[in-house]
């Protein structure tokens, strides 16, 4: 019966599907009390042998049976005279042994490093910790509003205006008022007279939401509802201030409304919207998720006199229907436009309207280029009050054109063109302009030798009386500029973030924009335990806010730009630091592995009580889409932390071919063969770990979500060096299983246009891989209302698993979206994943052979 019980197909797990987590010592190879109590009694000989055999490989018990011969029994029955004992010799021998043992013990004590006894007093990280206030990182969301002032939100909830030079603080909004309004978000008007609050906010997709908005005079004014003239108590899709005074816009039913100042009636300036079909100033699903990476698709001119907005038309895009199973007798569906690989894409156009005087709508003209028959708009940025920069990307995503458009005529002039044999990466990043708009800085891929291209800063300068621009590189090297922050014309300096130190780090640099282009690291060794940063500058660049994101607990400090002097700490997250100090946090190590011509980074998480003599289970986590990064020095406390701290597992991550920030050669290796090279690199990482004596080779697992779920499922059947199973179990959360079922912009970027050559799509199907699954435990988790990766992917996968008689479990979340916005659902999700791996890593008692044979005979 045991073999039949172990092999099941189609079991749907609930919260009770996983047993109570065993102690960490059980995962390390010890036997838990439950197993001791439940084990079958053994005969005298088996009991005598078992303790001697318990120290075998992996710490698992072995059982031996020894047949007794007739001679043995005769020896026991025949009596004999006992020999005379030499008591003096025995005493001397015992004394010598005692002295030797004492010397050995003394040597061990003297030579062994002192153990951190404080670890035993520290708690282990739990799932509850992930959601507790003690572990909640507070981001003050500081925003510069002048040369010397910024606005931020303190931990208690109040909104503060702070002057850097005088160090004076003014409370703009009391935290109690925000609580009374049940506000989720706030925004202060540029003149600091009014605040805009949103409440009853409901998420739509990853970034978008709907909600009710009110305006309130600072500091104690009564709230007044923000509504279109024709509707009261309206639920808006967006509301936000402009760059000057009290001007604001809001979007209702995909139409744009403008209000010159608070108290004046709003007017509808764009009225072509159609709910769910034609979007004005907002992204549809595809643009929000894959192109702009934001729900906002409108952009104010610097002086507030004009507004650029995108019109996205989904009328020709096929409809996808998300079912809702609960809450009604009959299931209902929510339709929305979702373009899959090869299907019709949304069309997009860019418009500019004047906000002073009669509304005049002007469309910006796309490039007249046959390669741009179908295109995306990936970036919009105002250069001056009348010039707007636009990046146009063809559907194949291998040709982009950066233009500068005249907002008064709609004519666009090409400023730069880029082309790739694979795909173009980082196409939604904004350039930084000089005040007159004649000079701008942007990031592009520049050849740097054998490792391919790296992303560096280029300056483009317009020449008087010439149609040609002067192009010059500001930075170079085998590292990437990750973001241009700002340009200081007065000092001829450019400020940016880069990976020059290490790919897994981010530091703040400045570079001269004239002469030698000399650069300087501003954040290196500036703050302790801070190697991964982001930053923002005051309007005149005299001061900057430095946000340390790791490896230590995140902090925010304010510095003088000239001498980097720390002026004060804005947020130290002291309660998180204390909570971390009181917990057994994982030890983090970094290594590199050599795969063909590449040196790939690995990150290893070990238990705080790690010792080389124990045996630990191993979990490989594969995550992130091509161009992303899993190995970094950012601070994180996740469910993986719980698995390491509370359950004694070792977790490993590896940035293999296809990952970002290591050159375009490595990035583009995966083109048209997703999964193939990633499997090789991730398996090399596993093989490297299996060479370590402290890794239990019989307890190895893999996990991934989204694209990582595709990879984890792809990797799970992989064989080891002896053609045996490498992985004991694996799990995939919301896996992509067939790229022709996924978003057009994503699939076509890496596999080419579907319909022209479908071989890459067929080769990357998971159906070809899961047939090789044998007895590994496989947990699939998916929300039924997942708007990003439809449950259809999992349904197709399960069909193949059933055909292959695979050993799988399915856990669904009815009517839940992709991003699990509910805290309760996230807790349940994390417990389910942890519980699955704890059970997978449990060391089962090996029954004696005779007992096993009896079970088989009973079957």
Curated annotation (Swiss-Prot):
An annotated Gene Ontology molecular function: potassium channel regulator activity
Disulfide bonds listed in the record: 405-412, 521-524, 530-548, 729-840
Membrane-topology descriptor: Single-pass type II membrane protein
A Gene Ontology term for the protein's cellular component: synapse
Highest taxon in the source lineage: Eukaryota
Tissue specificity note: Detected in brain cortex, hippocampus, thalamus and cerebellum granule cells (at protein level). Isoform DPPX-S is expressed in brain and some peripheral tissues including kidney, ovary, and testis; in contrast isoform DPPX-L is expressed almost exclusively in brain.
Glycosylation sites (chain numbering): 167-168, 313, 398, 465, 529, 560, 807
InterPro entries: AB_hydrolase_fold (IPR029058), Peptidase_S9_cat (IPR001375), Peptidase_S9B_N (IPR002469), Serine_Prot_S9B/DPPIV (IPR050278)
Residues in the Extracellular compartment per record: 111-859
Membrane-traversing stretches: 90-110
GO BP annotation list: establishment of localization in cell; neuronal action potential; positive regulation of potassium ion transmembrane transport; positive regulation of potassium ion transport; positive regulation of protein localization to plasma membrane; potassium ion transmembrane transport; protein localization to plasma membrane; proteolysis
Post-translational modification: N-glycosylated.
Signal peptide: none
UniProt entry keywords in alphabetical sequence: Cell membrane, Disulfide bond, Glycoprotein, Membrane, Signal-anchor, Transmembrane, Transmembrane helix
Region (Disordered): 1-63
Task of the protein: Regulatory subunit of Kv4/D (Shal)-type voltage-gated rapidly inactivating A-type potassium channels. Modulates the activity and gating characteristics of the potassium channel KCND2 amd KCND3. Promotes cell surface expression of the potassium channel KCND2. Has no dipeptidyl aminopeptidase activity.
Subunit and partners: Homodimer (in vitro). Interacts with KCND2. Identified in a complex with KCND2 and KCNIP2. Forms an octameric complex composed of four DPP6 subunits bound to the KCND2 tetramer. Interacts with KCND3; this interaction modulates the channel gating kinetics namely channel activation and inactivation kinetics and rate of recovery from inactivation.
UniProt xrefs under PANTHER family: DIPEPTIDYL AMINOPEPTIDASE-LIKE PROTEIN 6, PROTEASE FAMILY S9B,C DIPEPTIDYL-PEPTIDASE IV-RELATED
Family (UniProt): Belongs to the peptidase S9B family.
Protein name per Swiss-Prot or TrEMBL: A-type potassium channel modulatory protein DPP6
Gene behind this protein: Dpp6
């Amino acid at each position: 019966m045991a073999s039949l019980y172990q092999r099941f197909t189609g079991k749907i797990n609930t919260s009770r599907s996983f047993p109570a987590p065993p102690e960490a010592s059980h995962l390390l190879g010890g036997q838990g009390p439950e197993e001791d109590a439940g084990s079958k009694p053994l005969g005298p000989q088996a009991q005598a042998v078992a303790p001697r055999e318990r120290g075998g490989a992996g710490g698992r018990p072995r059982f031996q049976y020894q047949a007794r011969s007739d001679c043995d029994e005769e020896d026991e029955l025949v009596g004999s005279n006992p020999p005379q004992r030499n008591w003096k010799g025995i005493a001397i021998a015992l004394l010598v042994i005692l002295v030797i043992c004492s010397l050995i013990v003394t040597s061990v004590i003297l030579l062994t490093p002192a153990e951190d006894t404080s670890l035993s007093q520290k708690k282990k990280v739990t799932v509850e910790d992930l959601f507790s206030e003690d572990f909640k990182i507070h981001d003050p969301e500081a925003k510069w509003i002048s040369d010397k002032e910024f606005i931020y939100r303190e931990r208690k909830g109040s909104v503060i205006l702070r002057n850097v030079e005088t160090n004076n603080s003014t409370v703009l909004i009391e935290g109690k008022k925000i609580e009374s309004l049940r506000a989720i978000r706030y925004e202060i008007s540029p003149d600091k007279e009014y605040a805009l609050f949103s409440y009853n906010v409901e998420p739509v997709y990853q970034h978008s939401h709907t909600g009710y908005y009110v305006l309130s005079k600072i500091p104690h004014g009564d709230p007044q509802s923000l509504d279109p003239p024709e509707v009261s108590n309206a639920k808006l899709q967006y509301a936000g201030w402009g760059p000057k005074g009290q001007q604001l816009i809001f979007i209702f039913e995909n139409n744009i409304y403008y209000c010159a100042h608070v108290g004046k009636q709003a007017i509808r300036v764009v009225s072509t919207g159609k709910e769910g079909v034609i979007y004005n100033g907002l992204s549809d699903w595809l643009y929000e998720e894959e192109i702009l990476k934001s729900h906002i698709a409108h952009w104010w001119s610097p002086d507030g006199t004009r507004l650029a907005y995108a019109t996205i038309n989904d009328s020709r895009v096929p409809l996808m229907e998300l079912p809702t199973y609960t809450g009604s007798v009959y299931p209902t569906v929510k339709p929305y436009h979702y373009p899959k690989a090869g299907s019709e894409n949304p069309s997009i156009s860019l418009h500019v309207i004047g906000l002073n005087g009669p509304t005049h709508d002007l469309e910006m003209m796309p490039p007249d280029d046959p390669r741009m028959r179908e295109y995306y708009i990936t970036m919009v940025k105002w250069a001056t009050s009348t010039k707007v920069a636009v990046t146009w990307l063809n559907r194949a995503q291998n040709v982009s054109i950066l233009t500068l458009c005249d907002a008064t005529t709609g004519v666009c002039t090409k400023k730069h063109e880029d082309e790739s044999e694979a795909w173009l990466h980082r196409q939604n990043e904004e350039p930084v302009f000089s005040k007159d708009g004649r000079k701008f800085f942007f990031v592009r891929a520049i050849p740097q030798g054998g490792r391919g291209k790296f992303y560096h800063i280029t300056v483009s300068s317009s020449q008087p009386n010439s149609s040609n621009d002067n192009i010059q590189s500001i930075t170079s090297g085998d590292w990437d500029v990750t973001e241009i922050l700002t340009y200081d014309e007065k000092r001829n300096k450019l400020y940016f973030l880069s990976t020059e130190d290490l790919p897994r780090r981010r530091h703040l640099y400045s570079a001269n924009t004239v002469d030698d282009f000399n650069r300087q690291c501003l954040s290196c060794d500036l703050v302790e335990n801070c190697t991964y940063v982001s930053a923002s500058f005051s309007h005149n660049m005299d001061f900057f806010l430095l946000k340390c994101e790791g490896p230590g607990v995140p902090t925010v400090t304010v510095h003088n730009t000239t001498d980097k002097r720390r002026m004060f700490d804005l947020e130290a997250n002291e309660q998180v630091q204390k909570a971390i100090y009181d917990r057994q946090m994982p030890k983090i190590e970094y290594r590199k592995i050599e795969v063909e011509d590449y040196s790939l980074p690995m990150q290893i998480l070990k238990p705080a009580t790690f010792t080389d003599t124990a045996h630990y289970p191993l979990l490989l986590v594969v995550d992130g889409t091509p161009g992303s990064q899993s190995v970094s020095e950012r601070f994180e406390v996740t469910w993986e932390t719980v698995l390491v701290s509370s359950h004694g597992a070792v977790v490993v991550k590896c940035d293999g071919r296809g990952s970002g920030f290591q050159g375009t050669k490595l990035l583009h290796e995966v083109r048209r063969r997703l999964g193939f090279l990633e499997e090789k690199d991730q398996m090399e990482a596993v093989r490297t770990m299996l060479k370590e004596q402290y890794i239990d080779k019989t307890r190895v697992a893999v996990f991934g979500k989204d694209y990582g779920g595709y990879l984890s499922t792809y990797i799970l059947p992989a064989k080891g060096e002896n053609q045996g199973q490498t992985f004991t179990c694996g799990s995939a959360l919301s896996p992509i299983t067939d790229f022709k079922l996924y978003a057009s912009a994503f699939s076509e970027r890496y596999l080419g246009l579907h319909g022209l050559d479908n071989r890459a799509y067929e080769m990357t199907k998971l159906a070809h891989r899961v047939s090789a699954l044998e007895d590994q435990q496989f947990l699939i988790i998916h929300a039924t209302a997942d708007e990003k990766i439809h449950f259809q992917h999992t349904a197709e996968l399960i069909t193949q698993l059933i055909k292959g008689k695979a050993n799988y479990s399915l856990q669904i979340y009815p009517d839940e979206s992709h991003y699990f916005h509910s805290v309760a659902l996230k807790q349940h999700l994390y417990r389910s994943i942890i519980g699955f791996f704890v059970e997978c890593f449990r060391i089962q008692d090996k029954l004696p052979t005779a007992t096993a044979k009896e079970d088989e005979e009973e079957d």
